[in-house]
């Protein structure tokens, strides 16, 4: 399945594993926009931006990260549910940690079920093992559209205020001006509506979110949220989460990226 990779911002939820002999086997779940920087902060201690629960207990290894969330809010909600499965109404079917069950194994068990229930089951997520020697098969396995990757995430470009466009695309946008119309319903597109554009080079598709959602859902009757579909113009495969994430990438402020620096749960010394 050939999906266009969208440039944009990185939102990940990671799993740390403690290598300190005194605390070996401890784990920690957190949110980050920069995995390499975040693990350095954890190992440097709370004064350097690490979390209270990890401070002074290193070294820590970031062994696994889930990324591909369409927004920081979506990633933070996933983080909270992974940290507190017993409090999430989505995970009432997941049993508590067994006495003989290691913390690492328990968190993988919870993760396996999270990836199989709404709303996460329909997100374009990637499960990435940063330490392949820690890899375990999840049961149940992730959905087919969620790839399993290994090694560090690919470098992320600096987030521009506006995406770079070719000269031809720029001229096309100028020609459209304020009279741009939806490729599907032919009604006018308003800037505040955030029209979706196909990311494949040269594709002219511009559509209302609701129009493209209805088009995609023709392939998935009975669903409320599209998972994927084929562009009505170029016929190439697209993931819905990538399209929506690309639409909103330019409207979010860079300051939101620092949500990872001081999580409110780090202040609860329990």
Swiss-Prot record:
Top enzyme category: hydrolase
Domain GIY-YIG: start-end pairs: 9-94
PROSITE patterns documented for this protein: GIY_YIG
Residue spans, zinc finger SLX1-type: 182-234
Subcellular location: Nucleus
Tissue specificity of this protein: Expressed in testis, colon, bone marrow, brain, thymus and to a lesser extent in heart, kidney, skeletal muscle and spleen.
Keywords: DNA damage, DNA recombination, DNA repair, Endonuclease, Hydrolase, Metal-binding, Nuclease, Nucleus, Zinc, Zinc-finger
InterPro entries: GIY-YIG_endonuc, GIY-YIG_endonuc_sf, Slx1, SLX1_C, SLX1_endonuclease, Znf_RING/FYVE/PHD
A GO CC term attached to the entry: Slx1-Slx4 complex
Gene Ontology biological process terms in this record: DNA recombination; DNA repair; positive regulation of t-circle formation; t-circle formation
Main localization (coarse): nucleus
Origin superkingdom: Eukaryota
Cofactor: a divalent metal cation
EC numbers: 3.1.-.-
A GO term for molecular function: zinc ion binding
Function in brief: Catalytic subunit of the SLX1-SLX4 structure-specific endonuclease that resolves DNA secondary structures generated during DNA repair and recombination. Has endonuclease activity towards branched DNA substrates, introducing single-strand cuts in duplex DNA close to junctions with ss-DNA. Has a preference for 5'-flap structures, and promotes symmetrical cleavage of static and migrating Holliday junctions (HJs). Resolves HJs by generating two pairs of ligatable, nicked duplex products.
Assembly behavior: Forms a heterodimer with SLX4.
Family listed: Belongs to the SLX1 family.
Name the record gives this protein: Structure-specific endonuclease subunit SLX1
């Amino acid at each position: 399945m050939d999906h266009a990779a969208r440039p944009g911002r990185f939102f990940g939820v990671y799993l740390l594993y403690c290598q300190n002999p005194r605390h070996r086997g401890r784990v920690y779940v957190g949110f980050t926009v920069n995995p390499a920087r975040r693990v350095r902060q954890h190992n440097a201690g709370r004064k350097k931006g690490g979390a209270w629960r990890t401070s002074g207990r290193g070294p820590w290894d970031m062994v696994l990260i889930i990324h591909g969330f369409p927004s920081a809010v979506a990633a933070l909600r996933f983080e909270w549910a992974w940290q507190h499965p017993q409090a999430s109404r989505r995970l009432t079917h997941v049993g508590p940690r067994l006495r003989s069950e290691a913390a690492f194994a328990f968190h993988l068990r919870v993760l396996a079920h999270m990836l199989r229930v709404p709303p996460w089951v329909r997100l374009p997520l990637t499960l990435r093992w940063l330490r392949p020697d820690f890899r375990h098969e999840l049961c149940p396995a992730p959905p087919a559209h969620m790839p399993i990757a290994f090694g560090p995430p690919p470098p992320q470009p600096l987030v521009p205020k506006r995406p770079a466009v070719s000269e031809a695309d720029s001229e096309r946008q100028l020609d459209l001006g304020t009279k741009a119309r939806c490729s599907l319903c032919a009604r006018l597109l308003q800037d505040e509506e955030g029209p979706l554009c196909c990311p494949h080079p040269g594709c002219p598709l511009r559509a209302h979110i609701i129009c493209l959602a209805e088009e995609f859902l023709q392939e998935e009757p009975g669903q409320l949220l599209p998972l994927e579909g084929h562009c009505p113009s170029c016929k190439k495969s697209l993931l819905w989460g990538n399209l929506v994430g690309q639409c909103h990438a330019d409207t979010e402020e860079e300051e939101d990226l620092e949500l990872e620096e001081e999580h409110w749960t780090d202040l609860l010394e329990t």
